[in-house]
Amino acid sequence: MAKLTVKDVDLKGKKVLVRVDFNVPVKDGVITNDNRITAALPTIKYIIEHGGRAVLFSHLGRVKEEADKKGKSLAPVAADLAKKLVQEVVFPGVTRGEQLEAAINALKNGEVLLVENTRFEDVDGKKESKNDPELGKYWASLGDGIFVNDAFGTAHRAHASNVGISANVDKAVAGFLLENEIAYIQEAVDNPVRPFIAILGGSKVSDKIGVIENLLKKADKVLIGGGMTYTFLKAQGIEIGDSLVEEDKLDIAKDLLAKANGKLILPVDSKEANAFADYTEVKDTEGAAVDPGFLGLDIGPKSIAKFDDELTGAKTVVWNGPMGVFENPDFQAGTIGVMDAIVKQPGVKSIIGGGDSAAAAINLGRADKFSWISTGGGASMELLEGKVLPGLAALTEK
């Protein structure tokens, strides 16, 4: 990566501004998944161990009006982070003003402060989300000219707390998490060890058109699963029963299939049910077609075997999107089968592109078997599409 990283700057005695991604699920004041906090620890620890004074910024959820602030404070995150660091995390509970400035100026080397939810600034004119220049300048003024972006999950957004601060400091550098995310995902797409196989699932073709187009150019094969399977099948004239379909995307699906030159591999059977929720019958289809009155909710056993075969010998695998409704035990065999097929390949670099795939790997006990699990669903999708991420582009060149 041709950008400066946190290792390239002198941190001692400096108030170092750090954008982290602490957008974690909080229920009744309790954090239910702390993965993103844990992922930020190496960068935070590096800064404080090298004598920096870490001033952390993060958003939590969406905040559009005053009422949305309820339950969106970063207070529980500050408490959790303090436990993980085994030291106090100063939390003034505001996003600007004298109280915040005094607390930052009182920091000593090796101390940590967390600014309140940056999206609280969205209540009055979306200042954070629309990258208000004055807000970016103000937040930048709270530090000593160094900004560390370690929030891959928001790198595809141009917000005041990443791009805005970057524009107003001497050096904007990447943290370890951001550096690793780019190294794994971009390297996999731009310079993969081959065979390189991409696996795309999820419900909608519309969400993945750009990704499919880019990966058809880069990968040796692209395997398709999940709900979007049925738009591709219908585009080929195959009966899909009551399965999910995007009628307005059938022509795009046909076009992608025509351009793919055999690289796009579709399921050859499905696990179908006679309703999405209150079903009374679940069975495997004979072939690719789904029976009338049924809908496909997972890839079937023949498809699992086919995908296992296609993955044999793969050296780079990027997976984004589950194969079925994995939250339901009746429809998780496809996702489990594909995960197991990926991780058993000798010497494979296996990457999960965040979002539902990451949740599936964690919930189904396979997370530790992958080379890398991205912390940013949207950002990893845009990297897979070949897009430039604003948060990354704003960093200082080496």
Swiss-Prot record:
Substrate binds at residues 21-23, 36, 59-62, 119, 157. GO terms for cellular component: cytosol. Pathway: Carbohydrate degradation; glycolysis; pyruvate from D-glyceraldehyde 3-phosphate: step 2/5. Keywords: ATP-binding, Cytoplasm, Glycolysis, Kinase, Nucleotide-binding, Transferase. Pfam families: PGK. Its EC number is 2.7.2.3. GO terms for molecular function: ADP binding; ATP binding; phosphoglycerate kinase activity. SUPFAM superfamilies: Phosphoglycerate kinase. It catalyses: (2R)-3-phosphoglycerate + ATP = (2R)-3-phospho-glyceroyl phosphate + ADP. It is found in: Cytoplasm. It is an enzyme of class 2 (transferase). ATP binds at residues 208, 296, 327, 354-357. One of its GO terms (biological process) is gluconeogenesis. Belongs to the phosphoglycerate kinase family. Monomer. This is Phosphoglycerate kinase.
